[in-house]
Amino acid sequence: MSNQNSISRGSVWRKWDLQVHTKGTAKNDQFTSANFDEFCTALFKKALEKEISVVGITDYFSIENYKKVKKFVAEINNLKVSGKKVFSDQEIEDIKGIFILPNVELRMMPSTDSGRLINIHCLFNPDFESSIENDFFGSIEYSAGSGTRFKMNRQGIISLGKSLDSTLVDEAAYKK
């Protein structure tokens, strides 16, 4: 895989996969990986095999798993299983050349004629990662049946979860 920054000619066709849900995704997590590192290893092995240049890490109302994938890539040089490196030096270089961006999936009303919610995908410039939580999620609200409004940032989602079940601790309420 060639480095994205070494383009010296006009248009170049590249493969992008902009909707990659991860282990621990907020809805319908059916991944069988033992842990997040194992999931990321499989993800990047497949991305290298398919020569994917851009990956959008997708989740509902969150960029937490995007941050975990970025952390995985940042620490990839130290990744070992049974004392052996998981990726070769060339694979590590190629993985670090894959452009990874946050893709926030939103579900909204009204529903379609078939009763399904409308999905909207918001792709963000990774340079603005730190402001997504407060500026973006803090400006979106969910109106509960009671009329109570909840911001769709982490604290607002926890409050919403606890309004559904007051016995939940923060992390469980966030996932609810």
Task: Show where each model-derived region lies.
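Extended substrate/RNA-proximal surfaces in nucleic-acid metabolism proteins
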Residues: 2-6, 71-176
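An N-terminally biased module of ancient metal coordination in phosphate/nucleic-acid-related enzymes
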Residues: 1-115
